[in-house]
């Protein structure tokens, strides 16, 4: 790896990252969709396959998780307009947001209350299906609700699943695996919130805590799983299945936009702002959206100023060969879901030609935005889920990207979607504390 001095000389923005200042970065390596997709390791067929698998499991999900019954076992979240928040942002930052502002409430996804309910649950279901088909427990033509039986739970109990997590992925995988009957272990990093660990333990999940950060928890989980042939490791850093589980969100979002009569085409661009940790969730969603909307969708990743791992990896082209700690950043943030020091190389390399840019936001700003959203729209998100909220302001303010792609006029007829990644499962007293912090920082 290059010396820090050489990186600073080649990429002046590194200086601001080191100073943990908020930055906005336009990806110089973005390509036209038709060029980018040619070299992509994944394609539309892979996403369709994931979508079909989730449909096969829908009867099982509806039976085991009654809260999904109304949607027939499809795990989906609302897409809502947030006009009062839009006004508040325009006032606060003295910057008009051109176009309409919507919030995708993955914070309110059933089962585990975060975006991780998409990829995490999908990967567990895929593994369960492979085992069940292999051992003649089901055929693809069966109604998968038959998996909710003592016989199947006993069968799955011979196998184990492990994952390393800062919190939300652990919740999704822990809850789903335990329901099916698997023995499940979640390796939690130091920044994981206590309530998330408690909730997992209450579901019979084995939680192992580490003093170290996320990368260490993943490494340890992987090592232990490798030693046990009956253990399946959900690898958040390299998993194609997690990524595809997230990508399915795009076609669901397309239907919701149609219901709201929101047009997305060359004259009506779509901008999407996704909080980013190791990269799987935002990468998968952005990839799915690119498959559908091609060059008419513009995706941005949002990271905490103390954990800008994906921005650092993409900007330097070093991907997972560099961590924020390598340039002296501490990777300590209250945005626990985004507290990742080293990005996924797979996601960074896959998304590099598709991504419009990255930006960072401070913890203090996340708390202020949390309070603002609660006040204006009565929607409560966890701190990390607010990282996307400042995106529309940044894109409209630093309009170099809009000018470059001749979008300065078109953006007025466009739509901005902030991806609210988690929050509905946060205990009330914890949420009150978050709100108080936002209030103190606003006064």
UniProtKB/Swiss-Prot annotation:
Class of enzymatic activity (EC top level): lyase
Q: Which GO terms describe its molecular function?
A: D-serine ammonia-lyase activity; hydro-lyase activity; pyridoxal phosphate binding
Q: Which Gene3D superfamilies match?
A: 3.40.50.1100
Kindly state which reaction or reactions the protein catalyses: D-serine = pyruvate + NH4(+)
Known HAMAP family for this protein?
D_Ser_dehydrat
Q: Entry's PANTHER family?
A: D-SERINE DEHYDRATASE (PTHR48078:SF9), THREONINE DEHYDRATASE, MITOCHONDRIAL-RELATED (PTHR48078)
- Biological process GO terms, please? D-serine catabolic process
UniProt lists the family membership as follows: Belongs to the serine/threonine dehydratase family. DsdA subfamily.
Would you say which domain of life the source belongs to?
Bacteria
Looking up Pfam families in the UniProt record yields: PALP (PF00291)
* Keyword Transmembrane helix (UniProt): no
Instruction: Write the Enzyme Commission number(s) for this entry.
Output: 4.3.1.18
List N6-(pyridoxal phosphate)lysine occurrences by residue.
116
* Cofactor field: pyridoxal 5'-phosphate
Q: Protein name, please?
A: Probable D-serine dehydratase
* Keywords in alphabetical order: Lyase, Pyridoxal phosphate
């Amino acid at each position: 790896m290059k010396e820090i001095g050489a990186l600073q000389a080649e990429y002046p923005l590194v200086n601001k990252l080191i100073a943990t200042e908020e930055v906005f970065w336009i990806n110089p390596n973005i390509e036209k969709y038709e060029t980018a997709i040619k070299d992509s390791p994944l394609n539309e067929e892979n996403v369709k396959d994931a979508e079909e698998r989730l449909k096969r499991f829908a009867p099982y999900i509806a039976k085991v998780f009654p809260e999904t019954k109304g949607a027939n076992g499809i795990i989906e979240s609302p897409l809502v307009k947030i006009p009062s928040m839009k006004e508040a942002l325009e006032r606060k930052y003295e910057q008009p947001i051109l176009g309409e502002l919507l919030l995708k409430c993955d914070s309110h996804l059933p089962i585990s209350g975060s975006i991780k309910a998409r990829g995490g649950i999908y990967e567990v279901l895929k593994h369960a299906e492979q085992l069940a088909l292999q051992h003649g427990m089901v055929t693809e033509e069966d109604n998968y609700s038959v998996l909710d039986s003592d016989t199947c739970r006993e069968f799955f109990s011979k196998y184990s699943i492990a994952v390393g997590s800062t919190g939300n992925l652990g919740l999704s995988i822990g809850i789903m695996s335990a329901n099916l009957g698997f023995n499940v272990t979640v390796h939690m990093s130091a920044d994981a919130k206590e309530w998330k660990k408690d909730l997992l333990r209450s579901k019979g999940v084995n939680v192992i805590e580490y003093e170290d950060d996320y990368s260490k928890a993943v490494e340890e989980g992987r090592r232990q799983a490798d030693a046990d042939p009956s253990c399946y490791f959900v690898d958040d850093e390299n998993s194609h299945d997690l990524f595809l589980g997230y990508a399915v969100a795009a076609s669901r979002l397309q239907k919701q936009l149609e219901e709201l009569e929101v047009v997305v085409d060359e004259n009506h661009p779509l901008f999407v702002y996704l909080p980013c940790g190791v990269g799987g969730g935002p990468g998968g969603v952005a990839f799915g959206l690119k498959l559908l909307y091609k060059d008419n969708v513009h995706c941005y990743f949002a990271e905490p100023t103390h954990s800008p791992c994906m921005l650092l990896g993409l900007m330097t082209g070093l991907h997972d060969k560099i961590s924020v700690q390598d340039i002296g950043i501490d990777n300590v943030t209250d945005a626990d879901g985004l507290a990742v020091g080293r990005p996924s190389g797979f996601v960074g390399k896959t998304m590099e030609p598709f991504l419009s840019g990255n930006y960072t936001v401070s913890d203090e700003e996340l708390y202020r935005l949390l309070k603002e959203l609660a006040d204006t729209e009565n929607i409560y998100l966890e701190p990390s889920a607010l990282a996307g909220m400042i995106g529309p302001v940044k894109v409209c303010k630093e309009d170099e990207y809009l000018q470059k792609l001749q979008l300065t006029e078109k953006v007025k007829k466009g739509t901005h979607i902030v991806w609210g990644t988690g929050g509905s499962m946060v205990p009330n007293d914890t949420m009150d504390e978050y709100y108080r912090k936002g209030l103190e920082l606003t006064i």
